[in-house]
């Protein structure tokens, strides 16, 4: 290497393999904020992970039935989503899907809501900024199929 030159060139990330159109989703999101929907979709696309946005408990139940034996790995809640009432829906989902992780995100100033979300069964509650920052790791961890998890 010549003096004065560094090998710290940015490395291009390899393109993910194309996702099968019939792949079951293991991650569901109750998010109606368009900014966060776009952020989640773009991150999932880059990681080749399928995330489905649902608007009601009935939508989630229907999608889970269509997946057959494969259970959801992660359910994401925007805790400020008034259309689904997360604090009443989370305990119902946790009782039906005990092994499913539930992650909520909210404004960093909503300490009371954070506490209530933990009390009703939310496994992790993050401020919006931390959720955005950790989104790739969360999707990567929960997006692998059950067969891939047993191999790794």
Predicted features and spans:
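Acidic, metal-coordinating helix/loop segments flanking the phosphotransfer/catalytic sites
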Residues: 56-74
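Alpha4 helix (beta4-alpha4-beta5 surface) of REC/receiver domains from two-component response regulators
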Residues: 109-124
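Two-component/phosphorelay signaling modules centered on CheY-like receiver
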Residues: 35-52
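Conserved phosphotransfer microenvironments
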Residues: 76-93
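Long, low-complexity intrinsically disordered regions
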Residues: 1-12, 16
């Amino acid at each position: 290497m010549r003096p004065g030159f560094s090998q710290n060139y940015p490395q291009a990330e390899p393109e993910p393999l194309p996702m099968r159109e019939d792949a079951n989703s293991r991650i569901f999101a109750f998010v109606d904020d368009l900014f966060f929907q776009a952020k989640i979709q773009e991150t999932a696309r880059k990681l080749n992970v399928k995330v489905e946005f649902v608007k009601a408990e009935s939508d989630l139940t229907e999608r889970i039935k269509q997946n057959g034996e494969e259970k959801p790995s992660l359910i994401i809640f925007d805790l400020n989503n008034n259309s689904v009432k997360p604090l009443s829906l989370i305990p119902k989902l946790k009782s039906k899907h005990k092994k499913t992780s539930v992650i909520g995100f909210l404004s960093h100033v909503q300490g009371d809501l954070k506490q209530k979300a933990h009390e009703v069964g939310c496994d992790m509650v993050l401020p919006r900024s931390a959720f955005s920052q950790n989104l790739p790791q969360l999707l990567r961890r929960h997006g692998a199929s059950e067969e891939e998890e047993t191999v790794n």
